[in-house]
Amino acid sequence: MAVQKNVIKGILAGTFALMLSGCVTVPDAIKGSSPTPQQDLVRVMSAPQLYVGQEARFGGKVVAVQNQQGKTRLEIATVPLDSGARPTLGEPSRGRIYADVNGFLDPVDFRGQLVTVVGPITGAVDGKIGNTPYKFMVMQVTGYKRWHLTQQVIMPPQPIDPWFYGGRGWPYGYGGWGWYNPGPARVQTVVTE
């Protein structure tokens, strides 16, 4: 009886550890101090003065980089963030923001890159996208994370049956012991640290 309890405890502990390993966490650099930073740009832009001073977290693609006296201004085309605060690929832009970072950031290292920024909202300013007037939300960045794109090969699911012999007609058709035609693999682009 005691052996059974120990086995069950071991299985439960292993299952719990496996479940925890699948959890996605926000990197420390962009955690911020608020448990729920503002992430809805449409809501913020409807009344930006109400959100001044509140912590926000936005991410997307850096469209432009302006080096100014003592700071760098990133123009970011924002997209929704996933549970790990990574920009979601393939989503349309929700709008643009200016993210002011203290110090110098080299435009070569940031233009066209995916980033997530966190910090207090400082207001909204008028600007332009091309020749079109646009109102940008502005935030003071207290932390940022630059992301990388990686391609992964995704194989189709394999049969689970260890005694799977192959297609109908074996051994006269295709296959033999353990043969399985998985079909084409697909290449998927993912955002990684």
UniProtKB/Swiss-Prot annotation:
It is found in: Cell membrane. Residues 1-22 form the signal peptide. Pfam families: Slp. A lipid is attached at residue 23 (N-palmitoyl cysteine). Keywords: Cell membrane, Lipoprotein, Membrane, Palmitate, Signal. One of its GO terms (cellular component) is outer membrane. It is a lipid-anchor. The keyword Lipoprotein applies. PROSITE patterns: PROKAR_LIPOPROTEIN (PS51257). The keyword Signal applies. A lipid is attached at residue 23 (S-diacylglycerol cysteine). Its main location: membrane. PANTHER family: OUTER MEMBRANE PROTEIN SLP (PTHR37530:SF1). This is Uncharacterized lipoprotein YeaY. It comes from Escherichia coli (strain K12). The lineage of its organism: Bacteria, Pseudomonadati, Pseudomonadota, Gammaproteobacteria, Enterobacterales. The gene is yeaY.
